[in-house]
Regions:
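Short intrinsically disordered, low-complexity coil segments enriched in acidic
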Residues: 1-7, 64-68, 208, 391-393
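Alpha-helical protein-protein interaction/assembly modules
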Residues: 130-302
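Canonical BTB/POZ domain core
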Residues: 37-145, 187-217
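Cytosolic, low-complexity regulatory segments enriched in Ser/Pro/Gly with interspersed Lys/Arg
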Residues: 1-27
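Intrinsic-disorder-associated interaction segments
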Residues: 20, 24, 58, 253-256
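Extreme N-terminal leader/anchor segments
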Residues: 13, 19, 32, 43-44
């Protein structure tokens, strides 16, 4: 099963810009005289209605032909070989490039052709050409290529390219939302993205839910061709109409919705219901099963009691598994240089965290009495928070130009204390600058104890 739905190749300038790759040192004479002019050919290869007059000596560089000629295959002594091409990605042009790579030291790999050439290279076991296809892919990942690349490398086993595609998607899914990308992303890939703590979230977890809602609408109505600005309104209208037929069920409990359950399971609902407006929206949408929400409400109520009555001061050590799986994900785009101060919405168990960007520094402040706060604040002498900050700036194709991270850390703050948590070189600053944070305000051990049912 591939990672994306197939889509016709789009004619884009980037895709047709050839990437010149040096493969091996062979002479121009070999390429022109032996390959293109077929002089002194001792074997004819027939495939896809075309024929190539080639040389066994050169073909033996291919693992496929080397096995054929040295083994007990019937073709080992034949001068005319009919190649069966079971892979639909392989065409005549791809075979021409693959055979030519055995003779010449210069191969032109256009990004729009790289999948077909990779398919041919894998069939013929041309390790050098496979490697160069992978390099071309890594250098040309964009919103228009990422889906096709991911699909092909799942098929042909280029794990390093697959990793690069996933990194690109984690960085761009939320920061540079795109209608066509939402249409192409499969359930399997979306599940990996939504479940990751490395998802570059903009704003808060509610925005991840909103993006998922839009993605699900486009999966169900792929013919929709409006703009990104129109998408949320159209999505809400469509689901509103569907609710009339739900008969008391939420959408994920219907036959239409069941395929998407595994993706929505990765939402961190505890950070959605911690904000009143978000909690109301998710209830009104009737997409997420009420049992899921009830379970999270219970979990969060225990956490509130823990923070209020059990002298909870926050995490005392790094629990990477807990941070990866359950941390609050939030982010912000800084459009241009300047001073910024903000807080992310939601109830954080009395820890009112103010974030300031100024003079190439990011500062965290635990606000208690100095500034107004819409919710209650903890007056405990000290509170701790586990966090990670990531910074990134991107080029127009979504490639990460510069990045920096604090890694996971514990910060202990007294009442109204502030602390510089990141300071960076001005050379690293390219605006717009994207900031993404992970937070954990409550110790994981106590939360687990509070949620455990008493044994009979």
């Amino acid at each position: 099963q591939t990672g994306f739905h197939k889509r016709k190749d789009e004619q884009q300038p980037l895709l047709h810009a050839p990437a010149r790759k040096k493969l091996r040192s062979t002479s121009e004479y070999s390429c022109q005289t032996l390959f293109l002019n077929s002089e002194n050919s001792d074997i004819k290869i027939c495939a896809l209605g075309e024929e190539w007059r080639l040389h066994k000596m050169y073909l033996c560089q291919s693992g496929y032909f080397s096995s054929m000629f040295s083994g007990s295959w019937k073709e080992s002594s034949m001068n005319i070989i009919e190649l069966e091409i079971p892979d639909q990605n392989i065409d005549v042009e791809a075979l021409q490039v693959a055979f030519g790579s055995l003779y010449g030291d210069d191969v032109l790999i256009k990004p729009s052709r790289v999948v077909a050439i990779l398919a041919a290279a894998c069939m013929l076991q041309l390790d050098g050409l496979i490697k160069q296809c992978g390099k071309t892919m890594k250098e040309t990942i964009t919103v228009k290529t990422v889906c096709g690349y991911y699909t092909s490398v799942e098929t042909y086993g280029l794990d390093s390219v697959k990793k690069k595609c996933l990194e690109w998607l984690l960085n761009n899914l939320m920061t540079h939302q795109n209608v066509k990308l939402f249409k192409e992303l499969s359930i399997n890939v979306m599940k990996q993205l939504i479940g990751s703590s490395n998802l570059f979230v903009m704003q808060v977890e509610m925005d991840v839910y909103t993006a998922l809602k839009k993605w699900m609408f486009l999966q169900l109505v792929p013919s929709w061709n409006g703009s990104l600005k129109q998408l949320l309104t159209e999505t809400d209208v469509w689901f509103s109409k569907q609710r009339k037929d739900f008969e008391g069920m939420t959408f994920l409990e219907t036959e239409q919705g069941k395929p998407f359950v595994s993706v929505f399971r990765h939402l961190r609902l505890q950070y959605i219901i911690s904000d009143l407006a978000s909690a109301r929206t998710i209830e009104q949408d009737a997409i997420v099963p009420s049992e899921w929400l009830s379970s999270v409400y219970k979990q969060q109520w225990f956490a509130v009691l823990q923070a209020e009555q059990d002298s909870e001061v926050g995490p005392q050590e790094i629990d990477k598994e807990e941070l990866e799986g359950n941390s609050m994900r939030c982010g912000r785009k800084l459009a241009k240089a300047g001073e910024y101060c903000w807080r992310w919405t939601g109830f954080n168990f009395g820890f009112d965290l103010l974030v300031t960007y100024t003079n190439r520094c990011i500062i965290f402040k635990r606000n208690t009495l100095n500034q107004p706060c819409s919710g209650s604040v903890s007056l405990q002498p000290q509170r701790s928070v586990a966090f990670r900050i990531r910074l990134g700036s991107f080029d127009s194709r979504g490639k990460l130009l510069r990045s920096r991270t604090t890694g996971y850390r514990i910060l202990i703050l007294k009442k109204d204390q502030e602390q510089v948590v990141m300071h960076f070189d001005s050379r690293l600053l390219t605006f717009p600058l994207y900031i993404c944070c992970n937070f954990l305000y409550i110790s994981s051990e106590k939360r687990i104890e509070n949620n455990r049912h008493p044994e009979n």
